């Protein structure tokens, strides 16, 4: 039986599509299998130095002068958006006053812990607890830009070095005069003291009233928020922690 001429298979037209609507692809050619490449791991971000006691200064006096007009203009826009007239007599200077006040409320951005502690760490063979309590604290809630106010209690167990007592209050001032949440503020104070002195332990307790709870939202006038950070023996030894908590309540 005679065979007719062998015909090559008809080529599929370009752009031909499968029944699922996607373009057809040629089958993969055989070859050595390769392990699937793993996506590169994202590089770990280095810790920001601004939280440590040697952190950089986020803002300077020159920044204040340069940014004051823009900040005042922003407050003027806020007044207009509230339905007020920034040009009426009682509000003419309000944008500038508010801008200057906000720079003061956040002046902690202009200082670092190393500025404060430079000459105030002393060698001293004292191995009993040091406590400074009832340090007044004023800060700004970063969520609503309204104040929260209260008191800070600090205790540490020295390790051959002590800190000038007023410097503990200065540490509180630097970190509280920023846009904050109370939990972070409490930890920053404790970590700064730990990094500066390397004591056997540090305990910090913050009690505060938040205007965002008093003036808005649930409007609870007498509520207080209490946060604590315990490091070193204050965290590991229940007796040391209890002694600290008892002394700040006395």
Curated annotation (Swiss-Prot):
Region feature (Disordered): 1-64
Summary of activators and inhibitors of this protein: GTP shows a positive allosteric effect, and tetrahydrobiopterin inhibits the enzyme activity. Zinc is required for catalytic activity. Inhibited by Mg(2+).
Induction of its expression: Up-regulated by IFNG/IFN-gamma, TNF, IL1B/interleukin-1 beta, bacterial lipopolysaccharides (LPS) and phenylalanine, and down-regulated by dibutyryl-cAMP, iloprost and 8-bromo-cGMP in HUVEC cells. Up-regulation of GCH1 expression, in turn, stimulates production of tetrahydrobiopterin, with subsequent elevation of endothelial nitric oxide synthase activity. Cytokine-induced GCH1 up-regulation in HUVECs in response to TNF and IFNG/IFN-gamma involves cooperative activation of both the NF-kappa-B and JAK2/STAT pathways.
InterPro entries for the chain: GTP-CH-I_C/QueF, GTP-CH-I_N, GTP_CycHdrlase_I, GTP_CycHdrlase_I_CS, GTP_CycHdrlase_I_dom
UniProt main location, coarse: cytoplasm
Keyword Membrane: no
Record PTM text: Phosphorylated by casein kinase II at Ser-81 in HAECs during oscillatory shear stress; phosphorylation at Ser-81 results in increased enzyme activity.
Disease named in the record: Hyperphenylalaninemia, BH4-deficient, B: A disease characterized by malignant hyperphenylalaninemia due to tetrahydrobiopterin deficiency, and defective neurotransmission due to depletion of the neurotransmitters dopamine and serotonin. The principal symptoms include: psychomotor retardation, tonicity disorders, convulsions, drowsiness, irritability, abnormal movements, hyperthermia, hypersalivation, and difficulty swallowing. Some patients may present a phenotype of intermediate severity between severe hyperphenylalaninemia and mild dystonia. Dystonia, dopa-responsive: A form of dystonia that responds to L-DOPA treatment without side effects. Dystonia is defined by the presence of sustained involuntary muscle contractions, often leading to abnormal postures. DRD typically presents in childhood with walking problems due to dystonia of the lower limbs and worsening of the dystonia towards the evening. It is characterized by postural and motor disturbances showing marked diurnal fluctuation. Torsion of the trunk is unusual. Symptoms are alleviated after sleep and aggravated by fatigue and exercise.
Similarity-based family: Belongs to the GTP cyclohydrolase I family.
Subunit structure: Toroid-shaped homodecamer, composed of a dimer of pentamers. The inactive isoforms also form decamers and may possibly be incorporated into GCH1 heterodecamers, decreasing enzyme stability and activity. Interacts with AHSA1 and GCHFR/GFRP.
Annotated protein name in UniProt: GTP cyclohydrolase 1
Organism: Homo sapiens
